[in-house]
C-alpha cells in the first residue's frame, strides 16, 4: 500500500529534476540571412573554397567552452553549438568572406572545379571568457587548387572586448566569437582584394 505513493513520489521528483532546469539552446556562428548572399555567380569569377577549419581537438565539439584562468574550461549549462565548432567557424568565415569578396564565388562546400583557390585555416586558440572577452589566434594559407604552393600566407590575433558584465549570457559569448571571425574575414579579405 505504501509502495504506490512512494513510486509516484519518485516519478514526480525525477520529472522535476529533468524538466526543472533551464532549456539548452543551440547556437551557430553564422548569421541568418534574409536574402541571397551578394557574391559572384558568374562562371568567369574566381572561386574560393573555404576548407574545414583545423583547431585543437578539445575545442572541436558542440560545447560552448568558457575559459576560467590559464588551464580551466567550463561548458555552458544553457547553450551548445548546433554543429561542431570546426564546421561553425568554416560556415561563418565563408559567409563573411562572400560578403567581403563580391568578385569571388566563395563556398565551404567541396568543389570539383580544378581552378580557383582554396583557403586553409588553422585555429591555434579560440578563447571566450566569462565577461565576454574573446581572443582568436589563427593562421591561414590561400593556395591554388591546381598546386600546393601558397599564394598568400597570413596570421593574426583577433579580439573582441568584454561585454561589460561579470558573467556574459550565452548570446553575448556567441556574438563575441562571431565578431572575432568577422575580424579574421576582414584580414583575409584585404589580402585577397589586393591579390585579385
Residue spans of the language-model regions?
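Sec-dependent bacterial lipoprotein signal peptides
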Residues: 1-18
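Surface-exposed short loop/turn segments
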Residues: 19-37, 100-149, 163, 167
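Soluble periplasmic/extracytoplasmic beta-strand elements of cell-envelope proteins
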Residues: 47-52, 65, 118-123, 135-141, ...
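A structural "domain/chain start" motif
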Residues: 17-83, 115, 194-196
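Short secondary-structure boundary motifs at beta->alpha junctions and helix caps
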Residues: 72-80, 147-184, 190
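Juxtamembrane/interfacial segments around transmembrane helices
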Residues: 55, 142, 172-175
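Extracytoplasmic/secreted envelope proteins and their assembly/folding machinery
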Residues: 86, 90, 94, 98, ...
Amino acid at each position: 500500500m505504501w509502495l504506490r505513493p512512494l513510486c509516484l513520489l519518485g516519478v514526480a521528483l525525477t520529472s522535476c529534476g529533468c524538466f526543472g532546469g533551464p532549456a539548452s539552446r543551440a547556437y551557430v556562428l553564422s548569421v541568418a540571412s534574409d536574402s541571397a548572399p551578394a557574391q559572384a555567380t558568374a562562371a568567369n569569377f574566381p572561386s574560393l573554397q573555404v576548407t574545414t577549419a583545423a583547431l585543437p581537438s578539445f575545442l572541436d565539439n558542440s560545447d560552448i567552452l568558457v575559459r576560467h584562468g590559464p588551464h580551466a574550461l567550463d561548458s555552458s549549462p544553457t547553450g551548445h553549438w548546433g554543429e561542431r565548432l570546426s564546421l561553425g567557424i568554416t560556415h561563418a568565415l565563408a559567409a563573411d568572406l562572400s560578403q567581403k569578396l563580391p568578385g569571388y564565388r566563395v563556398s565551404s562546400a567541396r568543389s570539383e572545379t580544378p581552378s580557383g583557390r582554396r583557403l586553409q585555416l588553422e585555429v591555434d586558440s579560440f578563447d571566450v571568457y566569462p565577461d565576454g572577452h574573446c581572443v582568436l589566434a589563427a593562421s591561414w594559407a590561400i593556395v591554388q587548387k591546381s598546386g600546393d604552393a601558397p599564394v598568400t600566407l597570413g596570421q593574426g590575433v583577433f579580439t573582441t572586448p568584454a561585454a561589460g558584465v561579470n558573467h556574459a549570457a550565452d548570446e553575448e559569448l556567441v556574438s563575441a566569437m562571431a565578431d572575432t571571425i568577422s575580424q579574421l574575414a576582414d584580414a583575409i579579405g584585404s589580402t585577397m582584394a589586393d591579390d585579385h
